[in-house]
Amino acid sequence: MAEVRSNLNYAASHEWVELKDGIATVGISDYAQEALGDVVFVELPEMDQQFQAGDEIAVIESVKAASDIYAPVAGIVVAVNEALEAEPEAVNSAPYEAGWIFKLSLSESVAEQNLLTAEQYAALCESQDH
């Protein structure tokens, strides 16, 4: 079973979100990285770009496929994980730590955004396994 961290929120499209002081740190879940297989390239978003929740924001390429990453919340890109350019495999080895992809400065209340709790996300993953 893939690891689902209780201190994070999730999107149905398998991104995780850590909210702190109006900043959302985003990566892909352990479930998503397992499904993708070995990550070989991460196309990062551009700094200062604005996105709405659900917008395509980045791309992860694995040995299996290229997968779009979506903005789970609305905001402006304030940081990207440039280390992934040299070490994209961090998305596999540490999806919740060194494998974070980008950070957004929130542009609206998170309560209005359709994020899942860890429990809801775990149930979603379980339902997709069957």
Q: What does each of the following model-derived ranges do?
A:
Residues 71-74, 118:
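ATP/adenylate-binding site constellation spanning eukaryotic-like Ser/Thr protein kinases
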Residues 9, 43, 60-61, 66-72:
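Small beta-strand-rich domains/subdomains or short beta-sheet motifs embedded
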Residues 1-56, 89, 93-130:
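Acidic, low-complexity mobile loops and tails
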Residues 74, 78-79, 85-92:
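Charged, amphipathic alpha-helical coiled-coil/dimerization segments
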Residues 71, 85, 106:
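Histidine-anchored, small-residue-rich loop motif
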Residues 17-19, 63, 80-83:
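Residue-level recognition of beta-strand microenvironments
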